Amino acid sequence: MDKLEKALSALLEDAEVAVPLAAVLAYASKTGRISYNEVTEITGDNLEEVLLLGNKWRLLLPTKVEKSGAWEDRLLLCKPGESYELPNIVRYLVQNASKTEHWAPMRAIAEIFKEMDEPDWQKMPELLAELGESARNYQITATQIGQMCSRISLRKKVDVLIAELKAAGVMSPKLGSLAEVSRAGSPLYQLNPSLFTKKPRK
């Protein structure tokens, strides 16, 4: 088992599926994308299981969208002609794990925000920890994010930071249930579960 496989096994708690998924992620991390045919060549009979697990953990997302670019609007189809992409932060996670054997979200978020020229990039691991602590079932509101920014003295405007978190692949708008958004009283976001090794609060 190579370094990336070991890191994924610890995250997914499933060593068997981690092996073909690691091979797919390693290949896709070079360009950020992978085609259905390429996944088939790498995984063989495990194709569907790998794609479902990759999508569930937001490690590998379908490029085809139904309405918006939100994760919940991505159409996962297992057939020729389809393609899949890695959220930006997952590329950092995969490339680091391939060298270190460790799945390191804190390191990845600091690195990606440093690349994005975020002046407070060193505070991003603290923000990620706050997101994980405050989220329920991997969901967080814009109001909560604003409160976190105040607590850790982030200088950026909340709406700008939210746009950057979405671009980085840390989270995506939760648009499917208007009732949920109405109850929250603020825009609702789904966090990328692959960034959190602890199980979420319900």
Label each PLM-derived region with a short phrase.
Residues 41-63, 151-168:
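Short amphipathic alpha-helical interaction segments
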Residues 74-115, 185-202:
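Short, amphipathic alpha-helical interaction segments positioned at domain boundaries
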Residues 64-74, 174-184:
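Short, Lys/Arg-rich nucleic-acid/phosphate-binding segment
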Residues 58, 65, 87-88, 169, ...:
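Polar/charged low-complexity regions in secreted precursors and cytosolic/nuclear IDRs
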Residues 1-45, 99-150:
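Short amphipathic alpha-helical interface segments
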Residues 164, 183-186:
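Amphipathic alpha-helical binding modules
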Residues 11-12, 150-151, 161, 179-181:
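Tandem-repeat/low-complexity and Cys-motif detector
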